[in-house]
Amino acid sequence: MIDENHPMRAAGNFFGRRHGKPLRPHQSNLFEDLLPRLKLDLATPAPQDLRSLFEAPVETVRMEIGFGGGEHLHHESGRYPQSGFIGVEPFINGMAKMLAALDQAPRPNLRLYDEDATAVLDWLPDASLAGIDLFYPDPWHKRRHWKRRFVSDANLDRFARVLKPGAKFRFASDIEHYVNWTLQHCRRHAAFDWQAESPADWNDAYEGWPGTRYEAKAFREGRRAAYLTFIRR
C-alpha cells in the first residue's frame, strides 16, 4: 500500500555503478563489523526525535546525500560535534573510504546508510532535519537520463517535508547544465527560496569548506564549481 503522505520512489536508480575497485581485506572487514553498527535500520519506525539515533548528545540533525569518499562529511561531523549527521552513499568504494576514516577517527554523532537516499527521506519524520547537502551528484549527462538526476520535483517535495522551516538545502556542482537545472527546479518550487545577492554567493565555496577529491579533479581539468544555497520557507 502507498503512503499518500510520502512521494513514491522512482523506479530508476539515482546513482550509477555500485562497485569499482575490489575492496582490500581490511575494507571488507569494516563492511562486516563497523557498517552494521552505524547503519540506519529502516525496518523500524524512525524516532520522532532524531537526536536519539546518535551516541553523542546532539542538538540538530543534518543529512548529506551521496558523500563520495566522505571528506566533507567526516570533516563537518568533527567540526560540529553538537550536530548529528546522516550520510548516504550507495557506491561501495566511497563507503569503504568513509568507514576507514571512521575507523581511525570515530564520530559518535554520525550514522550511515548505503542504499537509496529516497528510502531514508521517506522514513524520516516531518520537519526533522536542519539541513540537506547534495554535493557533486551524478549529472547524468545524456538527455534520456535526466530523469535520474537527484534534483527533481518529487525529491524537492521530499526535502520540503523533512526540512525544518529556515533549514538549508545546499547543492554544489561543476556541471553548468546541472547547476541551471537545480536553480530552475528550486526557484519554481513553493517551499524554497534562493537568497543569493551577488556572484560571490555561488562562486565562493561554503564557509569552512574542506574540498573533495572529485572537486580537485574538476579544477585540474579546468571546470569551475557553483555553490548554491536554498532556504526552506
Swiss-Prot record:
Biochemical pathway: tRNA modification; N(7)-methylguanine-tRNA biosynthesis
Keywords: Methyltransferase, S-adenosyl-L-methionine, Transferase, tRNA processing
A GO MF term: tRNA (guanine(46)-N7)-methyltransferase activity
Gene (name only): trmB
InterPro entries hit by this protein: SAM-dependent_MTases_sf, tRNA_(Gua-N-7)_MeTrfase_Trmb, tRNA_methyltr_TrmB_bact
PROSITE patterns: SAM_MT_TRMB (PS51625)
Catalytic machinery residues: D138
Cited Pfam families: Methyltransf_4
Binding site for S-adenosyl-L-methionine: E64, E89, D116, D138
Stretches the record annotates as Disordered: 1-22
Protein name per the record: tRNA (guanine-N(7)-)-methyltransferase
Function: Catalyzes the formation of N(7)-methylguanine at position 46 (m7G46) in tRNA.
One cellular component term from this protein's GO annotations in UniProt: tRNA methyltransferase complex
HAMAP family hit by this protein: tRNA_methyltr_TrmB (MF_01057)
Enzyme Commission code(s) on record: 2.1.1.33
Similarity comment text for this entry: Belongs to the class I-like SAM-binding methyltransferase superfamily. TrmB family.
Reactions listed under catalytic activity: guanosine(46) in tRNA + S-adenosyl-L-methionine = N(7)-methylguanosine(46) in tRNA + S-adenosyl-L-homocysteine
Binding site for substrate: K142, D174, T212, R213, Y214, E215
Species in which this protein is naturally found: Brucella melitensis biotype 1 (strain ATCC 23456 / CCUG 17765 / NCTC 10094 / 16M)
